[in-house]
Regions:
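SAM cofactor-binding core of SAM-dependent methyltransferases
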Residues: 1-69
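Conserved acidic-Pro-Pro-aromatic motif
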Residues: 8-9, 21, 25-36, 111-192
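Glycine-rich adenosyl-binding loop in Rossmann-like folds that engage adenosine-containing cofactors
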Residues: 57, 62-119
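Acceptor-substrate binding/catalytic loop of class I
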Residues: 42, 102-106, 152-157
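Conserved phosphate-coordination/catalytic loops
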Residues: 15, 103-110, 131-134
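Generic beta-structure capping elements
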Residues: 4, 78-80, 186
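Short, hinge-like loop/turn segments at secondary-structure boundaries
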Residues: 52-54, 76-81, 163-171
């Protein structure tokens, strides 16, 4: 985070209970925003409480998932035995995998590009979305081409997708932060 320009915006998807919101918000200077996304009802409410308790005014928390296109999806919020998944809740891409007894939520899906728009400068996209990272990045490609942000993902997109979409822009995997992979744009300027 220390190498991320404090004057630019951060996109943070998969907020869980909002534990990253205070440090992300406090790392931004005046005018810079944290665009946070959490699709699960309980986790979204917990993130709202975290924002309130910490007086975070530069965070825009959206009750939705990020994906490749706007729409709806099914979020599995418990395992088949009914045990809550918490931060491990995940989008079910194949609806034939919906399991009786498991708690699922219908959630809104938005794209990063449609929410952020062209007037903001994004310096970091941080995705902890339980295997849905590639879909979220697909919906952020205009922002990525325009801003060349640092990208931090829990799960890497598949190799072909990386080669077709991020490698031509100058992105390389340059490190790890715990289990997350760091993708940095090296030597290719952002488009205007």
């Amino acid at each position: 985070m220390r190498s991320v320009d404090p004057t630019g915006d951060v996109v943070h998807a998969g907020t869980f209970f909002g534990d990253f919101l205070p440090p992300l918000a406090r790392s931004r200077t005046d005018g810079a925003l944290v665009w946070a996304f959490e699709p699960g009802d309980e986790n979204h409410r917990a993130s709202q409480v975290t924002m309130l308790l910490n007086g975070l005014e530069n965070v825009i928390l959206t009750h939705a998932a990020l994906g490749a296109q706007a729409g709806t999806a099914v979020l599995a919020t418990s395992d088949p035995a009914g045990v809550p998944r918490g931060g491990a809740s995940r989008i079910i891409r194949n609806t034939s995998l919906i399991v009786p007894g498991r708690v699922d939520e219908d959630v809104k899906v938005l794209t990063c590009d449609e929410v952020i728009g062209d007037d903001r400068r994004v310096v970091l996209i941080q995705l902890d979305v339980e295997g849905y990272e590639q879909m979220a990045l697909e919906g952020a490609m205009s922002t990525i081409r325009r801003c060349r942000p640092l990208i931090l993902v829990e799960t890497l997109p598949d190799e072909k997708w990386l080669a077709d979409n991020l490698t031509p822009l100058g992105y390389r995997i340059t490190g790890r932060v715990h289990a997350n992979k760091v993708l940095r744009c090296e030597g290719v300027a952002a488009s205007t």
